[in-house]
Amino acid sequence: MVQKQQASAGPGTEPKKRRRVGFSPADTGVEANECIKIYLVSSKEEVDSSDISSVKPVDLNDFFDGDGKIYGYQGLKINVWINSISLHSYADITYQSTINGDKGITDLKSALQNIFAETIVDTKDEFLQTFSTQRDFIRNMVSNGEVMHAGATDGSSKNAEVVPSDPQVIRMEIGSPNAGLLYSRLVPLVLLFVDGSNPIDVTDPDWHLYLLIQKKEEKEDPLYRIVGFTAIYKFYRYPDRLRMRLSQILVLPSFQGKGLGSYLMEVVNNVAITENVYDLTVEEPSEKFQHIRTCIDINRLRSFDPIKPDIDSAVQTLTKGKLSKKAQIPRFTPPLNAIEKVRESLKINKKQFLKCWEILIYLALDPIDKYMEDYTSVITNHVRTDILGKDIETPKKQVVDVPSSFEPEASFVVFKSVNGEEANTNVQVDENKPDQEQQLKQLVEERIREIKLVAEKVSKSGQTLKV
């Protein structure tokens, strides 16, 4: 290698200074979950109050690109205040210093606007003013809505009034005046508190909002605020029916555990019945909501007389002998006419009813400990069927080639196997079968745990579901 020579410095010459190469300092960043806190407040006095606790949203890291971290700040703290009256928000951002490290500096304003959109205001003073200037926002927005009840709808479609004593549900078509604007302010709550949810299409008239409204009497005019809501889509089912699909449901964190979620679901169930839709479905329910929904449906089914003989028949069969010792275990699924009766009368869809059916049988077994082994065998059979995606007990068609001098490529016979077992002696055993059996066992244990939790809750007489 040829090196470039440098002229030697004379005795009276100062040595040349070396250029320093600058490197950006390493910045490990901070997770959004660690530095952002969310507060729901209903008055300006609650802002910055030590008596107000933060609420836990979904994973905030998901709102920040890449690894979910915020870069370029030391000692970063972000307190986001949400006005539960007007649904405006304000972010109080503090930090010790900024560091323009190897990851740059996160644009906090842009990141927060991706969540809160037009609801976020720039200054604290502007935010505090919304408690007075936007005091009647909810009241004005829902004035043309339809008041719904758990027992029946009153049919009114204008000038909806809320009874002060109890929260009530007001329905609004998304295409109606004010509904789109109102939902746009609800979107941040959807993103923050409904896991995996996306905003609905406000241009699609088949969407309906069911708003859980609380009316609070004050010295001035009554104060209206939203404590929960659900978004439901109606779609066509051939030849002449509609189905209802519940897509989003939320009770604000500070109002959870008071039975409001159960009341909202009771209203929705009643709407499905009174409007005679085909059935009510739920889009990708969370584990928590599925538990609530199942508890509600179990109570409805326990008082539904047409299926009681079917439950008794299934229980009698299960208690006759040691099912766990039998080669073929009956499915213990409800008869088709029971499924149809439940769908037509209660609007519970087949998939949900099958889950409830297992719990109804569990509740009817007395004493449960005596029959738990056989019951577990039934649940194992159900779980295995769910995994396979088909009924393992249904006779399967098999094709077997047979010798023929007429047309060898087209010579075969078709027959149904006995008890759903394939008559093939060359069955290959999956090398991972022990792992599959262990996974099956874990799934069964999880299903049994869910069944017991629901059964315990609904068995407590006189207890109102606090969800």
From Swiss-Prot:
Entries under SUPFAM superfamilies matching the protein: Acyl-CoA N-acyltransferases (Nat)
Keywords: Acyltransferase, Cytoplasm, Nucleus, Transferase
Site (Interaction with histone H4 N-terminus): 207
Catalysis: reaction(s): L-lysyl-[protein] + acetyl-CoA = N(6)-acetyl-L-lysyl-[protein] + CoA + H(+)
PANTHER family associated with the record: HISTONE ACETYLTRANSFERASE TYPE B CATALYTIC SUBUNIT
Protein family membership: Belongs to the HAT1 family.
Protein name (Swiss-Prot/TrEMBL): Histone acetyltransferase type B catalytic subunit
Organism for this UniProt entry: Arabidopsis thaliana
